[in-house]
Amino acid sequence: MAFGLRKGWFRLALAGLLPFAGAAAEAAPAAKAARPAMWKLADKDTTVYLFGTIHLLPKGRSWRTPAMEAAIKGSDELVLEVANIDDMMAGAQAMAKLGISPGLPPIAERVPEAKRAAMRSMIAESGIPEAVYDRLETWAAALSLLGVTFKRLGLDPSLGVENQIGTPFRTSGKSVVGLETVEQQLGYFDTLSEGAQRAMLLSVVEESAETKAQFAAMLDAWTSGDLKGIARTFDDETQMSPELKSALMSKRNAAWADWLARRMEKPGTVFVAVGAGHLAGADSVQKMLRKKGLKAKRVQ
């Protein structure tokens, strides 16, 4: 199918798009030596650090390094995918605006009959009545159920990389800005075809039983700075359709590269933290910067 998502959606959410999703915490799995990838763009009066994140982490995961801490301390401004990452009200308002529509088919009819029992189990675990899901657009239902998967893995939004990086900037009164808004991020899903949305929902339901091992492998790849391991999630065309890849990755990476190129024209030191998937693979932000004559040097 052109809308194939198999085995890739969960990892895309954690390292690619969803910094506003969340759940509760458990102990972290064993990790390799911490060395998450970081790059630097620099000229005579401007320095931009690029750091790839995981949007949700388990409790106790070690990932900080001296090089990263020095870059954060020396930066005047923090740039995230979404600045108000912990603003649940903004997320709820955006979801209500974009994710609810009248006249939709029942949610049970939007997955194959063989998968309905598994989906209903996740709906029950979410604590949201199925009648509410019937009113949600398919992409919104998928995101809501993805939260069940995160909860099962013990992931905590307060421990996500963006929240932890943001604290020293906010407490010291430094600027924190976003490349996008929550509504803009949800809007990427809202523009997907219904076929792509249903593939997304089915993928969330099917992946729920498989994600523990996937998450452990992806987390180790991120922690150790294994770009090839991260990129496999995003470059495998059997895991992401061209429609999804364009909407959620390629177009956004190009827009961010444009933003970075403009930012390099102004003096100062900036720390940019975005999902690790955007900084790995064939359509990475760095490769798009290279087309503009800007080379990001890996420094960790």
Region annotations inferred by a language model:
Residues 37-248:
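Structured, acidic catalytic/metal-binding patches in enzyme active sites
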Residues 13, 34-36:
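Short beta-strand-initiation
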Residues 239-300:
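A cross-kingdom marker for long, charged
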Residues 24-33:
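Boundary at the C-terminal end of the N-terminal hydrophobic targeting segment
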Residues 11-21:
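Bacterial N-terminal signal peptides
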Residues 32, 42, 264-266:
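Extracellular/periplasmic catalytic domains that process cell-envelope and extracellular macromolecules
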Residues 2-13:
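Bacterial N-terminal signal peptides that target proteins for export
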Residues 33, 63, 255:
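Short, conserved clusters of charged catalytic residues that mark active-site
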